[in-house]
């Protein structure tokens, strides 16, 4: 054993990149998710040929800047399903030592969604009040996020969110956690670098309507990750994703893909599948609680003309 411990591999380091503020937050939240939450995952695979045909019709005759994206339509489909399944649009507060818990459902559907910004950065943004938005509103909201991101210092935005979360933890008596986070983020060689002096003053002089703020990045009521928008030729499914506490559910969406369809007359044709992955916190929900969501998704794909009413 001692000989094994003394063995060293000759490896050439290509790159060593220490965590920035965005990766720090992701690492912290996902680690907490797997530590605290009993995940249950189910998939729903509606046949999407007619749905995609109607989606194409939706954009006929529209100028490029007016076209509705598939991402916007999928977000609307999910939002309508969440209206019928409010149990998924909720937060949980559970104290394991006392075995006490409470699940709080919300009327507002605020979707946390990872987005690939024009800068190439991945950022999870909070799409507020989706329950009131039409397809056109959702399209405009997504475009506005990209517009404001161009004027935003993402490290500063993430630091503002992290600091606010840390101070909330202090208010709840989490002294050790608060001190540890402050030491980890603001001391040492690899501390988080934020704006200061003139740069900071000039940055915060940009109107909030023209840049992203902590309001845009704060915790939503549920997470939706459209992985298919990142890899449109992906021939696979999202097998699992993290629930971000205190949320009780997360939804992953793949890319439309070819699949064999067995017809009633015994013939087989090529169709399209769009896979929805639904992950829920078993402390808060059982399978029966998410069935209304799954049924709503199925209904929309069976009768896709409804999406024309959502414009």
Where are these regions (language model features)?
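C-terminal catalytic/motor cores of large multi-domain enzyme assemblies
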Residues: 1-311
């Amino acid at each position: 054993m001692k000989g094994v411990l003394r063995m060293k591999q000759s490896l050439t380091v290509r790159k060593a990149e220490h965590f920035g503020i965005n990766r720090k937050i992701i690492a912290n939240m996902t680690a907490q998710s797997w530590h605290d939450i009993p995940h249950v995952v189910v998939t729903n695979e509606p046949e999407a040929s007619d749905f995609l045909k109607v989606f194409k019709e939706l954009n006929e005759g529209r100028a490029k800047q007016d076209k509705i994206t598939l991402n916007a339509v999928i977000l609307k489909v999910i939002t309508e399903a969440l209206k019928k399944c409010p149990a998924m649009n909720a937060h949980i507060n559970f104290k394991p030592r006392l075995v006490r818990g409470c699940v709080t459902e919300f009327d507002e559907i605020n979707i946390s969604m990872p987005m690939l910004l024009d800068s190439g950065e991945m950022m999870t943004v909070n799409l507020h009040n989706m329950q009131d938005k039409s397809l056109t509103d959702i399209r405009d909201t997504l475009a506005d996020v990209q517009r404001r991101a161009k004027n935003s210092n993402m490290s500063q935005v993430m630091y503002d969110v992290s600091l606010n979360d840390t101070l909330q933890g202090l208010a709840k008596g989490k002294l050790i956690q608060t001190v540890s986070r402050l030491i980890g983020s603001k001391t040492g060689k690899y501390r988080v670098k934020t704006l200061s002096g003139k740069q900071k003053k000039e940055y915060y002089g940009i109107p909030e309507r023209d840049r992203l703020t902590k309001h845009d990045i704060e915790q939503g009521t549920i997470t939706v990750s459209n992985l298919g928008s990142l890899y449109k030729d992906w021939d696979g499914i999202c097998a699992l994703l993290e629930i971000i506490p205190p949320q009780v559910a997360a939804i992953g969406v793949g890319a439309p893909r070819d699949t064999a369809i067995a017809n009633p007359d015994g013939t087989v044709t090529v169709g399209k599948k769009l896979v929805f992955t639904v992950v829920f916190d078993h402390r808060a929900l059982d399978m029966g609680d998410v069935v209304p969501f799954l049924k709503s998704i199925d209904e929309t794909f069976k009768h896709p003309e409804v999406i024309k009413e959502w414009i």
